């Protein structure tokens, strides 16, 4: 079978590899659509913290697929079902896992980082992490469950009030998902501070009412920072109402420092929250939104490539003009 393997330092190859053999507690799945994102670029170019990846690694952590083989028949999932799979594989025994914070598992593994990902014709996964998606859910929406769950985790933590005025900073996939998902909390306003005017079309589809490329006037109850731009983080402190919340989802870089006016934070009684990954509960909540029909993310996949065209996909990820949403590999059916 073919797998897209990263060796780090810019080296990535489409290789013929031996198909995986599953254990009784695993399933074999044929990926249908696999997204690629900025984190995959960091893996390819070795810009990610080496503690989070094991080379060589088959990339691909945003995906949906169809079940080919089930290790144990004692499951609701059947061969032929279309599924999504939690990427974080928790140990299930540490104090974080026992508390339900599986995103903070002490010894977790992760699909596409420390074990083979879904930019491949076949992938084996733990059966306990597999979730069926209904026929009404598009492949595009299903593929975005992973990044959407990252956003769900953060929004659940921030707990915006009904009628809140919200600003999303950034115009990439995470920012667009944040704008769309936060709508389920019934805010009065969702604005976006982006970098490219060409992203306006996607922002509007996500439910954004006003799109800015320069710092907007006025103040917000909740600001979701999804750009990773350190300068935006500093500016956002002064854009919050007293008692407001700043939610950090973006990554400026492991060696990037961000200056903050602590006096402004304390005097305004602000809350600064960070959110990493997703827990099992956030994943289940996101899948439930899709299966219920309350969430449709089809609009976000804008570029598709065959796995053999991986070089073109990587180039598009680095430099495709706006509007640009999710870039994905079409692998199976």
Feature map (PLM): residue ranges:
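N-terminal Rossmann-fold cofactor-binding loop
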Residues: 193-196, 226, 276
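Glycine-rich phosphate-binding loop and adjacent beta-alpha segment
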Residues: 230-292, 330-333
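A short acidic, Gly/Pro-enriched loop at the edge of an enzyme's catalytic core
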Residues: 216-223
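NAD(P)H dinucleotide-binding glycine-rich loop of Rossmann-like/cofactor-binding domains
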Residues: 91-169
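C-terminal hydrophobic helical "lid"/dimerization subdomain
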Residues: 1, 280-333
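Glycine-rich beta-strand-centered segment in the early N-terminal region that forms part
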Residues: 20-34, 48-95, 134-136
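Mid-domain Rossmann-like dinucleotide-binding core that forms the NAD(H)/NADP(H) cofactor-binding site
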Residues: 137-213
């Amino acid at each position: 079978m073919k797998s897209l393997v990263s060796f780090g330092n810019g080296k990535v190859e489409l290789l013929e590899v031996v198909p995986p053999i599953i254990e009784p507690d695993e399933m074999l799945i044929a990926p249908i659509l696999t997204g690629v994102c900025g984190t995959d670029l960091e893996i390819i170019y070795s810009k990610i913290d080496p503690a989070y990846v094991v080379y060589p690694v088959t990339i691909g952590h945003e995906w949906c697929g169809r079940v080919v083989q089930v290790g144990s028949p004692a499951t609701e999932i059947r061969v032929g079902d279309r599924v999504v799979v939690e990427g974080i594989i928790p140990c299930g025994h540490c104090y974080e896992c026992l508390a339900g914070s599986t995103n903070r598992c002490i010894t977790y593994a992760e699909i596409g980082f420390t074990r083979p990902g879904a930019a491949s014709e076949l992938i084996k996964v733990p059966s306990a992490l597999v979730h069926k998606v209904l026929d009404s859910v598009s492949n595009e929406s299903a593929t975005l469950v992973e990044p959407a769950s990252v956003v769900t985790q953060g929004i659940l933590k921030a707990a915006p009030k009904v009628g809140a005025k919200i600003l999303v900073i950034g115009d990439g996939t995470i920012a667009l998902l944040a704008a769309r998902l936060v709508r389920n909390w019934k805010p009065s306003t969702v604005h976006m501070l982006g970098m490219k005017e060409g992203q306006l079309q996607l922002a509007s589809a996500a439910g954004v009412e006003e799109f800015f490329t320069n710092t907007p006037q006025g103040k917000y109850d909740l600001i979701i920072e999804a750009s990773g731009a350190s300068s935006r983080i500093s500016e956002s402190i002064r854009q919050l109402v007293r008692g407001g919340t700043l939610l950090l989802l973006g990554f400026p870089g492991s060696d990037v420092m961000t200056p903050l006016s602590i006096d402004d934070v304390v005097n305004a009684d602000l809350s600064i929250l960070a959110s990493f990954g997703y827990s099992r509960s956030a994943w289940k909540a996101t899948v439930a939104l899709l299966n219920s029909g309350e969430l449709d993310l089809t609009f976000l996949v804008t570029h598709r490539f065959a796995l053999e065209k991986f070089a073109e996909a990587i180039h598009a990820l680095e430099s495709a003009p706006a509007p640009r949403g999710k870039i994905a590999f079409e692998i199976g059916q």
